[in-house]
Design a protein with these regions (language model features):
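Flexible, glycine/threonine-enriched loop-and-boundary segments that flank and lead into catalytic domains
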Residues: 450-470
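A short beta-turn/loop motif at secondary-structure boundaries
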Residues: 347, 462, 501-503
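Divalent-cation-assisted or electrostatically stabilized phosphate/pyrophosphate-binding catalytic cores
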Residues: 61, 493-500
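Cytosolic, long alpha-helical scaffolding segments
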Residues: 384, 408, 415-416, 478-493
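Charged catalytic and DNA/RNA-contacting regions of genome-maintenance
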Residues: 1-332, 348-361, 365-457
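Short terminal or interdomain "cap/linker" segment that borders an active site or interface and mediates
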Residues: 492, 501-517
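Amphipathic alpha-helical "coupling" segments that flank catalytic cores
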Residues: 334-337
Length: 517
């Protein structure tokens, strides 16, 4: 390591902490990959493989992609089942003293994608976790882009296989006996060939730590309230899932707000062969949606609705009371053409609120996402009004549970301009008049010279020093220059910085404040 250049030493320090990830290492306007990562990515994405001096006799293999278009390349790699670690520059290279500080700002794996460009809006993107002993198993599924989590336990591996077939996760965490169980591994390789499998240590599933994580992130004090006290292996699986997210996607944990526990008997059990033969969501031959039951029934007008009807088809209701209640709701909507049509028109205007909120929680949203959320929220009063016209128990329940979120809508509309830039660094996204300090900083940025001249004139009048000047250098920032002949007139609130041959430089607190801004 000692013979490597400082930059390569930094690269290996970061890479050694992320050995299972392809490391996108920011260098100027590019994300670069080195050594084996570079060879693999150049082959997978058909990129030119070059080299870079690294302090050793042989040049380091290297390939790269422009940072502004990196998401497209990352999406292709994630789709192929690779895990990505994005290493960003943490300071301006022009201002850095020595080597630029860098660190991992984001990790992307097939089961933890939140970027809209990498997701199919019509289906959930699940991360699964399976924990098993020889007799018992627990399994859970999380879509961190929407915040929904399902969990159950069982004593039968057939149930585990059926659930994996139903949810079709992109990534599977495995612990305990599941890691070495040949039939489990064979099922995944044959039936879920696109899924990435991550073996995990037993300590990640330890019961007390798992229970504490569940209490912390799902805000559950008493497991008896939702039945978790009777689902011990579901607790193990949830603990392993949360442990993985803590280590790789800590920001995602704030968005997991919808834990749904279920038992096998709540839904009709369909094994993989039945699902395939019935062509519920994909055809046997082409694996496409067209020609399936979902293709016929999915006449939804929102991405959220499209995902929901897929879930309904994948998980047919089993309880006759629940089936009848849903049928009555559908019948009520069909019978009232006027209100149904009006409701449909409003729903067409609703953006994907689940994933918008997810991106906001994880810090990957842009300003237009905020405006899109406000626009979607603005539709809620009309939606609730039209639903209230239906005299049916399920629709009434939906109506009562709609939170209009007016405070959130008002905050966004008051703070963000109507047509904001996509990138934060472009500026101009906060409305004038919303925040006094931001308005002042904006004034300094756009008309700073005029304000400095005004301050200079004010200080001349206040001190009686006619030749007082305001200057600037990189060491002190803005400063006030006063000649030696006028040193007696310098006020007490000026702080001496250095003495010149013909006078002194002083800096008062107002000027210092502007420099810091």
């Amino acid at each position: 390591m000692a013979e490597l250049t400082p930059m390569m030493q930094q690269y290996f320090e970061i890479k050694n902490k992320n050995k299972d990830y392809l490391l996108f290492y920011r260098l100027g306007d590019f994300y670069e990959l080195f050594f084996d990562d570079a060879k693999l990515v150049s082959r997978e994405l058909d990129l030119t493989l070059t080299g870079r001096d690294c302090g050793q006799e042989e040049r380091a293999p290297m390939c790269g992609v422009p940072y502004h278009s990196a998401e497209g390349y990352i999406a292709k790699l994630v789709h192929k089942g690779y895990k990505i670690a994005i290493c960003e520059q943490l300071e301006d290279p022009k201002q850095a003293k020595g080597l630029v500080k860098r660190d991992i700002i984001r990790r992307v794996t097939p089961g933890t994608v939140v970027d809209a460009s990498m997701l199919d809006e019509s289906r959930n993107n699940f991360l699964a976790c399976v924990y098993a002993t020889h007799e018992d198993m627990g399994i859970c599924f999380a879509d961190i882009s929407t915040g929904i989590v399902y969990a159950t336990d069982t004593e039968d591996w057939t149930d585990i296989f059926n659930e994996l077939a139903r949810f079709a996760p992109k990534e599977i965490l495995a612990g305990g006996f599941a890691i070495s169980f040949d039939e489990f591994r064979r099922f995944i390789s044959e039936r879920l060939e696109d899924a990435l499998v991550e073996p995990m240590e037993d300590e990640c599933f330890e019961s007390e730590a798992a229970a504490e994580r569940i209490r912390q992130y799902f805000h559950i004090e008493d497991f008896k309230e939702n039945g978790l006290n009777m689902m011990h292996f579901a607790v193990h699986a949830l603990g392993g899932l949360l442990d993985y997210l803590e280590k790789t996607q800590p920001a995602s944990l704030a968005g997991l707000n919808d834990l749904r526990l279920y038992r096998q008997g709540q839904y009709m059990e369909l094994d993989l062969n039945a699902r395939r033969n019935l062509e519920l969501c994909e055809t046997m031959r082409t694996k496409e949606k067209k020609g399936t039951l979902l293709w016929v029934l999915d006449q939804t007008h929102t991405a959220m609705g499209s995902r929901m009807i897929r879930q309904w088809i994948e998980k047919p209701l089993y309880n006759p009371l629940h089936i009848t209640r849903r049928q009555q709701a559908v019948s009520a909507l069909c019978d009232d053409v006027i209100n149904r049509s009006a409701l449909t028109d409003v729903l067409r205007q609703v953006f994907d609120m689940e994933r918008l909120i997810g991106r906001i929680v994880y810090g990957t949203a842009n300003c237009r996402d905020l405006r899109a959320l406000a626009a979607a929220i603005s539709c809620l009063p009309e939606i609730r009004s039209y639903l209230a016209a239906f005299d049916q128990s399920l629709l009434k329940e939906l109506t009562e549970n709609i939170d209009l979120l007016q405070d959130v809508q008002e905050l966004i509309e008051q703070a963000i301009v109507e047509d904001p830039p996509i990138l934060l660094r472009d500026g101009g996204l906060i409305r004038s008049g919303y925040h006094e300090e931001i308005d002042h900083l904006r004034s300094l940025a756009s008309g700073g010279k005029g304000e400095i001249a005004a301050i200079e004139q004010r200080e001349r009048e206040r001190t009686g020093i006619p030749k007082l000047k305001i200057g600037y250098n990189r060491v002190f920032g803005y400063y006030i220059e006063v000649s030696r002949a006028n040193s007696e007139a310098v006020p007490e609130n000026y702080v001496r910085k250095q003495t010149l041959a013909n006078g002194g430089d002083y800096c008062d607190y107002y000027i210092t404040g502007n420099r810091e801004r």
